[in-house]
């Protein structure tokens, strides 16, 4: 199904083909959504830039364009405002026809891409032996949302979890556990993740203060890298313990992701160094092998190195990133790779991408994109922490969200004098609590910091998940009250006469354009903004237009509008990773 915006642009392009001198370039896009609804639904603003090329008044050019374009079956007669803005107002009958097509379309108007382009989305990426914290929330749910949108568009998406499962910290941890709890290095489940994190902190403290411990830890890393059987077994047990804990979080958030940690790329690291050597990119600096790039300097103006091999022969994470990129392009067959990490890593990715280009690993038309995000802050405006000043564990945050959602539900049930089963209350609390956390994050422009507030995210009013879920549940109550199975409804006819019907119709027809915008911008908040506006528009429609008590054809038409709204909300929320509820 072709979106209305695309149809209008096609009509204008066909009508204006060959109408201007060959040296004149038509601005694009020809048609855009109206900046103000009072002027219409769409507008064509090209007369002003064309005036400079043609040396003619923009209003005269606008009049010429209006004469050439025939949109009589789509919109009311075109009007010209101001110096040459062409306003387009869609016909109600045309809107009704488009809605019927939308109702018959499983994808709700979103077209599938041609061919199966493979896109890698690299997200989440926690570190072994550490608990996932609130910082991992953003990468995990933003990455999941982008993967869902791309999958829905028909791309072949490979979701990868680049966990930190290798490096000095393992030598440090293994050395410490040999002293204080050797059983953990030979027995599965000897530790829970909390104990492991505590031991990690204690090991780090020893590493920073004790030279002998530091040297023993380095030897443990060497043994691990050399494939020593006992060291490998200990490492595998530690990784497996963390992996199980990560999976509990992923199950709670409904995240599907394939783990491929840093250790996977170990065999390829010497080859990366050799390649950079062959390309004459390496410079020795204090015994380390580095790449120096233009445009990356410290405060004194000295060029910053990208270290690929340390002075002790070990490799840096930049080396692993280069090996991973090479593998993803040449073995996984990726045509685009999206990295979802905090904005603090922007400099690293800019350097890494530039080195990859210079080394010939990254070539056109392959795309690599860093998708940065800001911090999660507390209501005091500072980085979100516990009262004790520690980083908030993601597990605790999600548990509290569900607990608070349950408390809100119990309060509401008491006020409404409703009685519900334990199963109902558990499901509603889980979906509302987790959905609220996800939506609160995704509804922010990801490049910005945002303030985390349980009270705001769980509110039934405003731009929140509960508000969207309630709008969906309200439509399901119409279905139950009227004994109507939306899935069995005939397409029928959509009659749009009331102002709120027209506004709802126009909003429903914007879904495909919104999904395209999210795909291009990689900004999930664009979808959240749309769903919030759709929910508000539907609620105004519901308050002003009787549905079940209306007479046909209005009754059938309004039921179809309700069904389309419910389907759009359900699909849109599912792309955010939020399941709906028939009752709340």
From Swiss-Prot:
Q: What NCBIfam families is this protein classified in?
A: argS (TIGR00456)
> Keywords in UniProt for this one?
Aminoacyl-tRNA synthetase, ATP-binding, Cytoplasm, Ligase, Nucleotide-binding, Protein biosynthesis
Record's family?
A: Belongs to the class-I aminoacyl-tRNA synthetase family.
Is Cytoplasm one of the keywords?
yes
Q: What is this protein called?
A: Arginine--tRNA ligase
Annotated PROSITE patterns: AA_TRNA_LIGASE_I
**SMART domains attached to this UniProt entry:** Arg_tRNA_synt_N, DALR_1
Q: Which reaction does it catalyse?
A: tRNA(Arg) + L-arginine + ATP = L-arginyl-tRNA(Arg) + AMP + diphosphate
Native source organism of the sequence: Synechocystis sp. (strain ATCC 27184 / PCC 6803 / Kazusa)
State where the protein is found.
Cytoplasm
Name the InterPro entries for this protein: aa-tRNA-synth_I_CS, Arg-tRNA-ligase, Arg-tRNA-synth_N, Arg-tRNA-synth_N_sf, ArgRS_core, DALR_anticod-bd, Rossmann-like_a/b/a_fold, tRNAsynth_Ia_anticodon-bd
Write out the GO cellular component annotations: cytoplasm
Q: Which HAMAP family does the record match to this protein?
A: Arg_tRNA_synth
Class in the EC hierarchy, top level: ligase
Subunit arrangement? Monomer.
The residue numbers the entry assigns to motif 'HIGH' region are 126-136
Give the molecular function GO annotations. arginine-tRNA ligase activity; ATP binding
Q: E.C. number, please?
A: 6.1.1.19
GO BP: arginyl-tRNA aminoacylation
